[in-house]
Design a protein with these regions (language model features):
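Catalytic core of PPM/PP2C metal-dependent serine/threonine phosphatase domains
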Residues: 93-127, 136, 314
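N-terminal segments that mediate ammonia production and transfer
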Residues: 3-10, 17-29, 66, 76-97, ...
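ATP-dependent adenylate-handling active sites, centered on carboxylate activation for C-N bond formation
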Residues: 8-16, 85, 105, 126-131, ...
Length: 319
């Protein structure tokens, strides 16, 4: 989780941009960088996961172009090797460093090539224009709006755009923006063919895809931890991850000191798979005192979202 922002014109001062961008500093506490592209500003708050050294800091730049990306590019090593064979060199181990060379080679067709969850803003120096894109499912957040002069502005969270844009809208998943238009490059709901496999084959395929999906998300330079509630979803993820690991994975669970049903079942799962397990206890007082902070971070007063996020916030804070 990082934070990105792009102001696609010179109608904003550096100080005003920085003030708006600072509202999501919590998404990327490790480092911050803002650059002027000549046609606008790009900002990046970093939470280092891949390529932990300073060379992995964004925005990445190439021949005057620049990009900021909040995302994970799966299988980037294979793409990197192909680009190296074409003569490109890389300075870091960051998965996102491949994006500018990839764009230079394939343009907006690159988005269909990515196995990734991402939101990005790219400045194309050759065309002196901005491009933005979001993954097909919309896993990574991205919002946009227009300032009073009609210039488009992109950001990871809506709160970055408050006071700049009169109307703030979610960037459509599976689309890229270029030349004033939003173009769908992949519709996740589109049915290309109807499957008639028997139940056994379907179950086998689901199992294989689940394992593959978990395995590719274990690739990181930073330590990987797992939130375990004891429910079906988190228990399956942790069990598969433990099978893929040659040492105990780190699992974390949270609950109240009384009637902690999640803690009970999480411990049963942790004991069964052999993880290194940590229990975090929260009190009613902690929940109440954290309420305003959680609402501010979420940017919503939706009761269901707030209730579901409270335990997540407190366990992540403890970690």
């Amino acid at each position: 989780m990082c934070s990105i922002m792009g102001y696609c014109s010179c109608d904003v001062t550096y100080d005003d941009f920085k003030a708006a961008f600072e509202r999501t500093k919590s998404r990327g506490p490790d480092d911050t960088r803002v650059i002027f592209t000549g046609k606008g500003l790009l900002g990046f708050h970093r939470l280092a996961i891949m390529g932990l050294h300073p060379e992995g800091m964004q925005p990445f730049e190439l021949d005057g172009s620049a990009v900021v990306c909040n995302g994970e590019i799966y299988g980037f090593e294979r793409i990197k090797q192909i680009l190296q064979q074409k003569g490109y060199s890389f300075q870091s181990q960051s998965d996102c460093e491949i994006l500018l060379p990839l764009y230079k080679e394939y343009g907006t067709a690159m988005f269909r090539m990515l196995d990734a969850e991402f939101a990005l803003i790219l400045y194309d120096a050759e065309e002196q224009a901005f491009v933005a894109a979001r993954d097909p499912i919309g896993i990574r957040p991205l919002y946009y709006g227009y300032d009073e002069k009609g210039s488009i502005v992109f950001a990871s969270e809506a709160k970055n755009l408050v006071g700049i844009c009169g109307k703030i809208m979610p960037f459509p998943p599976g689309h890229y923006y270029k030349d004033g238009e939003f173009v769908c490059y992949r519709d996740a709901a589109e049915v290309s063919s109807i499957c008639h496999d028997d139940l056994e084959t379907v179950c086998k395929n689901i199992r294989e895809k689940l394992i593959a999906g978990i395995e590719k998300r274990l690739v990181a330079d930073a330590k990987v931890g797992f939130l375990l509630s004891g429910g079906l979803d988190s228990s399956l993820v942790c069990a598969v991850a433990q099978k893929c690991s040659d040492k105990p994975i780190r699992t974390f669970a949270i609950g109240m000191s009384e009637d902690a049903i999640d803690l009970k079942y999480a411990k049963e799962v942790a004991d069964y798979i052999g993880s290194e397990h940590t229990e975090v206890y929260m009190t009613p007082e902690e929940v109440i005192s954290s309420l305003e902070t959680v609402i501010a971070l979420l940017g919503t007063y939706d009761i269901t979202t707030i209730r579901a996020s409270m335990g997540m916030y407190l366990v992540c804070k403890a970690i």
